[in-house]
Amino acid sequence: MTPKSAALVDDLVSILKSVQTKRSAKGFLKKLFPQPNEDATPSSTHQAPPVRLAVTKLAGVETIADDTLFGIGKTIQRMSRLGMQSIIVPSMSTPTGLSACFASGKCASLAQVNELREQLRTQELSQLDRVSDILCQAGVLARPSYGTLYASNADGVSLEAQRLLLETLQNGYTSVIGNSVVNPGLCLTQITPDQVVLGVVRSFAQMKSNVSVERLIVIDEVGGMPCPRRSHGSSHVLINLAQEYVSLWPTLSPKHAENLQLVNSCLDLLPHSAAAIVTTPDAAVFNGSTRQSHPIIHNILTDRTVFSCSLPVDRSPETKTTLLRRGTPIYMYHGTDCLTNGSVSWDRIWYLLNDSFQRVFDMPRYLERIRHNLALVIVAGDYEGVAIITLEQPQTPGAAPVPYLDKLAVLQKVQGTSAIADFVFNAMCSVFSQEIVWRSRLDNPVNKWYFERSRGSLLSRSTPWRLFWTGYKSADQKRIQEYLDVIDSIQPTWIK
């Protein structure tokens, strides 16, 4: 077995250790070893294999130490073995030379343009050489693209050498590209590394070829977007841009806000399955022993974060990495009005529950049960996920109502990698932050997921249920008994 084959076997074994479900493992293996199209014509079978692409921005590259850059190169090499090719865009911390001229917006003669290009070679291209050399030392087939220029037009910056760059990727090379732009009138235009990254993503997204941009990676000393709920400046684990972008952006520092805006603009151009990773240079280093906890490699393997965003904060490790997805909007309907005013489609919820649980749900009997105590309905996207919370009255006289998670369901086709269950669970906990309870059968394969997110758990002595609860409120023995009374008294509403 060759060293490359042995490394690939190690990665495949890592999949089995790191994924939580067979569905996730099968999904990755399908990407790594795509099945041939049975309907393919003889001519189509000779086409180049599909290119799965990651576009990586190396921010402040001149401040990244050589050994750190070498470790990042090992990560890029591992990504390539896992079927993900890379385009690297190194960026300088401060605008110099040509970038400063671009910022002035002044027009120039052809001679001046050529002179400024020479300045670029001495300032910016030296970093292209450095990055390429170190990546090669790390085992990456890196190729600096000195002549890759971009065109500036009304739509922004676009890549002019698409086909050449695509051929480079198809041949297994990693392209390291610079940041120079001249518009058709030879008028120098301001350009930033973010515009270059966006231009590359836009160009490949619009390109009618066998290539898909699956990841945007931003390696920046500031790391992921900080989360106020997490200690010591730890980052958001996962951001649902469809739900959180507008409210999150104004709260961030200028650098974090720039990175968030770049990610949002790029993911808007890409398929819903694409994702972005924002992390630090140190976290991006691969040393061989960090495969299962490496934020980039783990995500390539599983489409997930290293740990879930819906875990209790005090049980989550510190992180400087944020995974971002276009995600899905979350809609909340409070109280019982949504039972009758048409704001919620109960027919679609019935279909969702049947699909998720693979059972037939008795919706008329269920609606009768909740018509006086429905507290909240949470709908994810186009009825891709749902949570139904009721307020249940314990048997103890004068006891406070118990918030009860009656139903949590996700369509089967989006289970596993979409994080919809996490988004819905987080939304629920944001409303019922003090306490909420739910129950599960002892043989439910989802119980591991429930254990990780609960503050406590207890077996019922009289029914086949396990009680779970979470929230900031500390539950004493009396309150826990009230929880048990609630879960024991509710009758299931399944037909079969």
Curated annotation (Swiss-Prot):
<keyword id="KW-0028">Amino-acid biosynthesis</keyword>
<protein>
    <recommendedName>
        <fullName>Amino-acid acetyltransferase, mitochondrial</fullName>
        <ecNumber>2.3.1.1</ecNumber>
    </recommendedName>
</protein>
<dbReference type="GO" id="GO:0004042">
    <property type="term" value="F:L-glutamate N-acetyltransferase activity"/>
</dbReference>
<comment type="function">
    <text>N-acetylglutamate synthase involved in arginine biosynthesis.</text>
</comment>
<feature type="domain" description="N-acetyltransferase">
    <location>
        <begin position="333"/>
        <end position="493"/>
    </location>
</feature>
<dbReference type="GO" id="GO:0006592">
    <property type="term" value="P:ornithine biosynthetic process"/>
</dbReference>
<dbReference type="InterPro" id="IPR006855">
    <property type="entry name" value="Vertebrate-like_GNAT_dom"/>
</dbReference>
<keyword id="KW-0012">Acyltransferase</keyword>
<keyword id="KW-0809">Transit peptide</keyword>
<dbReference type="GO" id="GO:0006526">
    <property type="term" value="P:L-arginine biosynthetic process"/>
</dbReference>
<keyword id="KW-0808">Transferase</keyword>
<dbReference type="InterPro" id="IPR011190">
    <property type="entry name" value="GlcNAc_Synth_fun"/>
</dbReference>
<comment type="pathway">
    <text>Amino-acid biosynthesis; L-arginine biosynthesis; N(2)-acetyl-L-ornithine from L-glutamate: step 1/4.</text>
</comment>
<dbReference type="GO" id="GO:0005759">
    <property type="term" value="C:mitochondrial matrix"/>
</dbReference>
<dbReference type="Pfam" id="PF04768">
    <property type="entry name" value="NAT"/>
</dbReference>
<comment type="similarity">
    <text>Belongs to the acetyltransferase family.</text>
</comment>
<keyword id="KW-0496">Mitochondrion</keyword>
